[in-house]
């Protein structure tokens, strides 16, 4: 009920013997309270809707990526289950993720339409869009190889989310570098295949994670580090619309960034 503020304001004015102008003042104060409460309730409703859409779209697009290679195998389903495990999805949340994954596997899944809808609810929040794309890239590389059809789907996703080809290619390099810190996958030289990371991280890997060059100065590297940490701060992302279930992945990404930065500082000798 959006009138409680006005009712209480008028009641308090009458009890205090405020007369006509006291009632008017109580009514105005109550009106301001009702408006503030209404805006807050609308924000929470929009926030829940944004988180629900982010969650559903994430797993729908995962399903679409998997189906783009052809028939969905048991291995593909196992990989999807592993990603759900990483997000600590259980019970109703896991069932919802599985249902969304199946929706994405349909032959007529409207990818471009879904991406436009997703972009519109993000309201230009690039950190949310970036997190979504990073999750999809991880899903595409999870089986150890990047199928040409998966790459084509990723390009469509990036295009509809307003990410240029150059930005997307940089994301790929950042994910490749991050694989050395997060136990993921790395790309084989000269090809599109990715394999389980076996070597330790190098300065080049760390710089790729931060999107900088080994020759960049300390100021440039620190600026890139702070920007990435701000964009991947789990609490900030959840406040902007990231589903709480995906906070763990945001934490893991932030840890990769932190580890990469520490290695760069050690290798280049700055604090």
From Swiss-Prot:
It is found in: Cell inner membrane. The chain crosses the membrane at residues 7-31. Keywords: Cell inner membrane, Cell membrane, Chaperone, Membrane, Transmembrane, Transmembrane helix. The keyword Transmembrane helix applies. Residues 32-271 are cytoplasmic. GO terms for cellular component: plasma membrane. It is a single-pass type III membrane protein. It holds the Pfam family DnaJ. Residues 1-6 are periplasmic. Residues 205-271 form the J domain. Regulatory DnaK co-chaperone. Direct interaction between DnaK and DjlA is needed for the induction of the wcaABCDE operon, involved in the synthesis of a colanic acid polysaccharide capsule, possibly through activation of the RcsB/RcsC phosphotransfer signaling pathway. The colanic acid capsule may help the bacterium survive conditions outside the host. The transmembrane domain is a dimerization domain. HAMAP family: DjlA (MF_01153). This is Co-chaperone protein DjlA.
